[in-house]
């Protein structure tokens, strides 16, 4: 008995881990909850009005919990930008590169960027918000994860490749065409994130495809 007591006093106690997910998995899950909540709050309120308290409430966490994972609002903003670009913009580029025609490439990229296939388009809303906030707050701009810059680069690549393959004429004004398509994309992105329903967006994308293929209307001779 005495030896048992002495053993218990001298041997460090190893805490038994209860049932449930391991701490690392829970930490990753909490981090994702924060990022998802921040994406929604930033989109709804803008960068200036968004607070850690509002994000904590949306994530069903405490404000100190947000601070535990992200030192300040700018750090959290950059993380949301990075993740949103990785999921949406990169996916759009990947899908588009599987296509061979300009219209199919643009449609694939636009559909992915606007989350037209999803009922939840919070990421599309945030992409638009991130472009606006980068104009208001240049310090928030991150060239590596600049969705406007990436969109412009993709459209320029698609247009130039279409010219090289003979799909567009060689006298095409590339710069103005690229800017027009980028403007259309972000206008549709705003509609996707803040205005239209899922079904309405799908119809808009379809009308865009008809317009670009010159099949939206036919003039009577």
Language-model regions: role of each:
Residues 79, 90-123, 174-181, 205, ...:
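Hydrophobic alpha-helical connector segments
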Residues 33, 37-75, 79:
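Helix-turn-helix
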